[in-house]
Amino acid sequence: MRSIFENGPIEINGKNDRKLLVRKDGFSLNTGNKEINVSFDDIRYTNVTRYCNSNSSYMVMMVAKDGKNIEFDTDVTPVGGGHNILETKTILTAFAASRLGKDFPNNLNTLDIELTHSLKEKQISISNGVIKGAKNSIRIDDIHTVKCVSNGALTRFAIYAGTKKRLFNAPDFAVVCNELTAPLLEAIVTRNTGKGIDFSRGDGFE
């Protein structure tokens, strides 16, 4: 995965001495009141909330390998006439690049990383060409269709193997949309079929 962070860190400065420095292997955030230093090697997966308002701050939770949660707010200053997602997007892009690796998307069948977590599947990961959770799994070579489905608050990817008709159009596997699953599934379904993710149901506000 080509990464702009290979050329050096990206610095974002805000009001009240706020400073974010994002590197290819982690980041530091000084809010003016406290400082956070994170190495991506210590992180299992991320969760971002408060994204329903396009000009409000975000709450980023990073679940660390030691079981502790690292929580902080990003993009706390509204941006007139634009979507204030610069801090959030920069951190998530760097994290995704560190996880997917330099060879992405040519390493799909050799990736061995944790992707996310859900109540049903618990830990969801990809290893040896298989996306798997506690109850279900799917070979990436069998993936034929990926649909983005949103209700306005929660966005997930419905994953289908083959073209067979199914009851209530139930997917073979489902994962939350995040900075890892989006580029990963886009690369998989494009490689398999020449077509990317179906985003026609991705806007839950309409």
What are these regions (language model features)?
Residues 5-8, 86-87, 118-121:
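A broad, low-specificity signal for short, low-complexity segments enriched in glycine/proline
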Residues 12-53, 116-162:
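Phosphoinositide-binding peripheral membrane targeting modules
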Residues 1-12, 16-22, 206:
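Short Lys/Arg-enriched alpha/beta "domain-start" segment
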Residues 4, 26-28, 63:
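Compositionally biased, low-complexity repeat tracts
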Residues 44-115, 142-206:
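Acidic, Ser/Thr- and proline-rich intrinsically disordered linker/docking segments
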